[in-house]
Amino acid sequence: MSDTRRRVKVYTLNEDRQWDDRGTGHVSSTYVEELKGMSLLVRAESDGSLLLESKINPNTAYQKQQDTLIVWSEAENYDLALSFQEKAGCDEIWEKICQVQGKDPSVEVTQDLIDESEEERFEEMPETSHLIDLPTCELNKLEEIADLVTSVLSSPIRREKLALALENEGYIKKLLQLFQACENLENTEGLHHLYEIIRGILFLNKATLFEVMFSDECIMDVVGCLEYDPALAQPKRHREFLTKTAKFKEVIPITDSELRQKIHQTYRVQYIQDIILPTPSVFEENFLSTLTSFIFFNKVEIVSMLQEDEKFLSEVFAQLTDEATDDDKRRELVNFFKEFCAFSQTLQPQNRDAFFKTLAKLGILPALEIVMGMDDLQVRSAATDIFSYLVEFSPSMVREFVMQEAQQSDDDILLINVVIEQMICDTDPELGGAVQLMGLLRTLIDPENMLATTNKTEKSEFLNFFYNHCMHVLTAPLLTNTSEDKCEKDFFLKHYRYSWSFICTPSHSHSHSTPSSSISQDNIVGSNKNNTICPDNYQTAQLLALILELLTFCVEHHTYHIKNYIMNKDLLRRVLVLMNSKHTFLALCALRFMRRIIGLKDEFYNRYITKGNLFEPVINALLDNGTRYNLLNSAVIELFEFIRVEDIKSLTAHIVENFYKALESIEYVQTFKGLKTKYEQEKDRQNQKLNSVPSILRSNRFRRDAKALEEDEEMWFNEDEEEEGKAVVAPVEKPKPEDDFPDNYEKFMETKKAKESEDKENLPKRTSPGGFKFTFSHSASAANGTNSKSVVAQIPPATSNGSSSKTTNLPTSVTATKGSLVGLVDYPDDEEEDEEEESSPRKRPRLGS
C-alpha cells in the first residue's frame, strides 16, 4: 500500500458542478464477484475502508485528462474522478480500463458520448462517416471552418468527432498561425471568424484540447483571438492587460519552474473564464464544466505544492513579522497569504484542515495580530480577510489561541481586542469593515459552534475569558456615549485613537435651580432631549447599532454571563438613553435589546426592569412619536402586546400602576386596555384567595402581606442609611441565595450614586447619567403643564404649608423641592422626614391625569 504510483484522490461532482473530495487512498483493479466483473477499488490510506467500488462497464465512457486524471459518469448525474499522484499509476489503470473495453490505451476517451436520440441517428449514418473531414486550414476557408464548429455544438456525437479531428491533425496550432497572419494583414473579417472558431472549440469542453490551447506556446494567441468579438466596435485589449498591467509578484522567489508555470496558467485560464468569455446561457452552462474542473485541479495542485514547501512558507512568515520589513513588502506578503487562503477554498474539508493546521503551526495568528494593528489600510483589510477564512473554517482554533495568549499578554494586545478595536476604529463612513468584523466576533462567541468534551467545556472557558478580558472593550463606546463622565470619555478617546462627534453634549449644570413650587419645562417627560447625551453623529450611531446587535445576540445565547454584566453595568438603562437618538434605527436597536431581555420571561430581569423603572424611556419615546404610524410606534406596541399575550404579571402590574394614565388615551390598539384588564383580573384573583383564608391567618401577626414586607424593606434601608450615612440602592431587594443578582451590584450602585450626588445638591436628581424620570409634583398647575405628553403623578402633600414636602423611601423616591424624581437612590438628608412617610396613604405613587 506504500506504492505511490497507485495513490489517488477520489472526487465526485456535486449539484453546483464543483468537485467534492471523497478521500485519499490506493487504487487497484480486481475482479469482484458481487459485481460480476473487473472493478476499480480504492481503499482509504488512513484506515483501509472502501472509498470506491466501481465496476468497469464496457459501455461507460472513460476520459483521461492532464495525464493524471481519469473521469467518468456512473449515472445521469453522478460523475467520478480519480486524481493520481503519479502519471505512471494513471497509465497503468487506464490500460486496465481499455483492456476491459477492448480499446487502444493511446486514446483519451474510450467511448463516444451519445444520448438516445443521437443513437438512432448514429445507427442510420454510413460507416464511412466516423470522422469529420476538416477543411484545409487557409484564410479563405475560415468562414467554412467557423460554420462547421458552430454547427456541431448541438450534437454530442459530432462534438466528440470534431474534437478528435482537431486533436489528431494538430489543427489548433495551424489556426493560431492564421490568427497571426490575419492580425498582421488587419483582416478584420478573418479575425471575427477566428473568434467564433476558438470560442466554439472551448465549448467542445475537451480537456485534451484545453491542454494544447492553454500551453505557454498557445495561450496568448488564444486570448488574442477572443479579443475580436464581432459584437464589439473595437477589439478588447486583453493581451495588453495580461502582459503589462497584471504583474506576477514573487514575494519570495519560487524556484520550482513547474509551480511557477502552473500559477501563470491558472491565472490566465481564470481570466478567460471570468472576463473574456460571456456569461453562458442556461443552454450553455454545462459546455464549460471541463474548464471549471481544469481550473479547480490546478488550484488544488498549487496549494499542495506550496503547502509541502515548508521552507518557502517559513520564509514568508519570518519576513511578515520582521520589524525591518518595509511597508510595501509587507503589503505584498499579506496579499499573497490572502490569495493563498482564497485558493485553499477549493480544497475539501479534510485537506483544508491540514492546510490551516500547517498555517497555525507556522504562526499565522500571531502574525495577523501584528499586521491587523498596522496603520496601512490595505494591509489591515487583507489581514481581516485572512482572519475571516480562519474563523469560518475553525473558530475553535482561534478561541484556543486567544485563551492561551491571555495567560501571557495584557488585555490591550489580545487578538480579539485588536479585532474589536479595528471594528470601533473603522474609518469607512458606511463601516463596511466593521460589519465584517462584527460577523466574525459573532461567530467566535456563538455557543452553537463551541465544543464540549469530557475533560473541559469550551463554552464556559471561552465565555469566562471573553467577559473578563474583552467585553469592556466592546461596550466602551456604548458606555461612553451614554455617560456624563467626561473623564471616562477622554480616557476612551485617548486609549483607542479615534474621534467621534458628540452632537448632544451632557448638561452638567442648569442656569437656574428649580423652585419647590414649580417644575422646569426641561424636566417634564417628553421635553428632555437636550438633557440627554445622544450620539447623533451618523457614523457613531452605526457603530453603536453594531455593538447593540452583538449584545442582543449575547442576551439570547449567553444566559448568566450577560445577565451579570447587564446588572453590574446597569447596562439596560444606559442602552435606553439611545431611545433619544435622532436616528430611528439606533432607537430601534435599543428597543430590540430590551425586547430580547423581556422575551426571555426571566423574573430576575423583570425585577431589574421594574425596580429601575426602565419602561419610562420607552413610553417617553412612544409619546414623543405622537400620532406618527411608523416602525418605532409598531415596535413599542409589539413590546407591550408581548407582555399582555404572555401574561407577564410583574411587568403588567408595574406598567398599569405607574403608566396607565399616560397610555389610556391610546385606543387605536387594545393593548393597553388589555393590560389593564389582565391586571384587574389578577388583582381580583388575589383578593378572592385572601378572602378564602380564615381571618386569623390574614392578621399581620401570622401573615406578612406585601405592604408589611415593603415597610420592613424600607426599615432595613433606613437602618443602613443611619449606620453608614451613604446613598444606597433603595428599591432592590437584598439578594437571596436563590437569586442570581451579582454580589457587587449594590456596592457598584452605591459608589456610583454617591459620587453623582456630590455635584448635584441643587440640581434635579436623575437616576443615572443620561437617565430621566416621570416628574412628580404637589402642584396641580405642574400636573397640567404645557407639554401635553408629560406624565405627572399626583402625591398628596405631607404637610399643609409645604415646609417639609419631601417623601423618602418609596419604591420611587419623590423630591418635590428638587423638581425631579430619583429612582434608585435615597439621600441621607432625607432621613429626618421618615415619620412623614409613614403617614403617607400610598407606598407607590399613582399617575395623575
From Swiss-Prot:
Domain WH1: 1-100
Region (Disordered): 714-849
Stored Gene3D superfamilies: Pleckstrin-homology domain (PH domain)/Phosphotyrosine-binding domain (PTB)
Keyword Membrane: no
Main localisation: cytoplasm
Bias (Basic and acidic residues): 733-764
Listed Polar residues bias regions: 776-818
Residues the record lists as Phosphoserine modifications: S117, S695, S840
Compositional bias (Acidic residues): 714-724, 827-838
InterPro entries, per the entry: ARM-type_fold, EVH1_PP4R3, P4R3-like_central_dom, PH-like_dom_sf, PP4R3-like
Keywords carried by this UniProt record: Cytoplasm, Cytoskeleton, Nucleus, Phosphoprotein
Residue stretches in coiled coil: none
GO cellular component: centrosome; chromatin; cytoplasm; nuclear speck; nucleoplasm; protein phosphatase 4 complex
Localization of this protein: Cytoplasm; Cytoplasm, Cytoskeleton, Microtubule organizing center, Centrosome; Nucleus
Domain of life the protein comes from: Eukaryota
GO molecular function: protein phosphatase activator activity
Gene Ontology biological process terms in this record: DNA damage response; gluconeogenesis; positive regulation of gluconeogenesis; regulation of double-strand break repair
Tissue specificity: Moderately expressed in tissues and specific brain regions examined.
Entry's family note: Belongs to the SMEK family.
Quaternary structure and partners: Serine/threonine-protein phosphatase 4 (PP4) occurs in different assemblies of the catalytic and one or more regulatory subunits. Component of the PP4 complex PPP4C-PPP4R2-PPP4R3B.
Its job: Regulatory subunit of serine/threonine-protein phosphatase 4 (PP4). May regulate the activity of PPP4C at centrosomal microtubule organizing centers.
Protein name: Serine/threonine-protein phosphatase 4 regulatory subunit 3B
Organism this protein belongs to: Homo sapiens
Gene: PPP4R3B
